[in-house]
Swiss-Prot record:
It holds the Pfam family Urease_gamma. It catalyses: urea + 2 H2O + H(+) = hydrogencarbonate + 2 NH4(+). GO terms for molecular function: nickel cation binding; urease activity. It is found in: Cytoplasm. The keyword Ubl conjugation does not apply. NCBIfam families: PRK13241.1, urease_gam. Keywords: Cytoplasm, Hydrolase. One of its GO terms (cellular component) is cytoplasm. One of its GO terms (biological process) is urea catabolic process. Pathway: Nitrogen metabolism; urea degradation; CO(2) and NH(3) from urea (urease route): step 1/1. Belongs to the urease gamma subunit family. The keyword Cytoplasm applies. This is Urease subunit gamma.
Length: 100
């Protein structure tokens, strides 16, 4: 299978988010890459599901709380940007203050 660098990056994000969701379900606190991957995948999947940009941003900003992440991780992530594929094309989605 021949994948573009962008497709390889998406696969890595989805793989890490799968691990992160499982760790979160076990009650483990997430580190920086795990938290970013969950926020990113939530945004990408919301877009793919046909949700509006506003709904995607809102959902992605509510998927994690400070209790879900290791100390200091929330402060390291002031925003997350991801190019998501919506039903009418791709858009850059910026999730501000994604961990509250």
């Amino acid at each position: 299978m021949q994948l573009t660098p962008r497709e390889v990056e998406k696969l890595m994000i989805y793989t890490l988010s799968d691990v992160a969701f499982k760790r979160k379900a076990r009650g483990l606190k997430l580190n920086y890459p795990e938290a970013v991957s969950i926020i990113t995948v939530t945004a990408m999947e919301g877009a793919r599901d046909g949700k509006s940009v506003e709904d995607v941003m809102k959902e992605a900003s509510q998927v994690l709380t400070k209790d879900d992440v290791m100390d200091g991780v929330a402060d390291l992530i002031p925003n997350v940007q991801v190019e998501a594929i919506f039903t009418d094309g791709s858009r850059l989605v910026t999730v501000h203050d994604p961990i509250k």
